[in-house]
């Protein structure tokens, strides 16, 4: 598990009150982790703050799984 993955899973764990070990990379925030729309907004804001980036609304809509969020941050960090 790389640093980005650890940080994102820690954020998810805190906001959704789920143990980090139970968060799978292919998990959907809505379907698998039972997040609602407010949780998603909170997750996006926490990720933006943690990684000091801004995520557009268009991009935020695409970040619907743990892995997509990890990939997004990894790609942002490469730029």
UniProtKB/Swiss-Prot annotation:
Its main location: cytoplasm. Residues 1-77 form the Carrier domain. The modification O-(pantetheine 4'-phosphoryl)serine is found at residue 37. It comes from the Bacteria. InterPro entries: ACP (IPR003231), ACP-like_sf (IPR036736), PP-bd_ACP (IPR009081). Keywords: Cytoplasm, Fatty acid biosynthesis, Fatty acid metabolism, Lipid biosynthesis, Lipid metabolism, Phosphopantetheine, Phosphoprotein. It holds the Pfam family PP-binding. The keyword Iron does not apply. GO terms for cellular component: cytoplasm. 4'-phosphopantetheine is transferred from CoA to a specific serine of apo-ACP by AcpS. This modification is essential for activity because fatty acids are bound in thioester linkage to the sulfhydryl of the prosthetic group. GO terms for molecular function: acyl binding; acyl carrier activity. It is found in: Cytoplasm. The keyword Cytoplasm applies. NCBIfam families: acyl_carrier, PRK00982.1-2, PRK00982.1-3, PRK00982.1-4, PRK00982.1-5. Carrier of the growing fatty acid chain in fatty acid biosynthesis. Belongs to the acyl carrier protein (ACP) family. HAMAP family: Acyl_carrier. This is Acyl carrier protein. It comes from Buchnera aphidicola subsp. Schizaphis graminum (strain Sg).
């Amino acid at each position: 598990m790389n640093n980005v993955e650890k940080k994102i899973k820690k954020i998810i764990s805190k906001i959704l009150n789920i143990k980090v070990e139970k968060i799978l990379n292919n998990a959907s925030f809505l379907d698998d982790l039972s997040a609602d729309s407010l949780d998603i907004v909170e997750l996006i804001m926490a990720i933006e703050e943690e990684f000091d980036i801004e995520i557009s609304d268009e991009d935020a809509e695409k970040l619907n799984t743990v892995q997509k969020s990890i990939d997004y941050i990894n790609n942002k960090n490469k730029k």
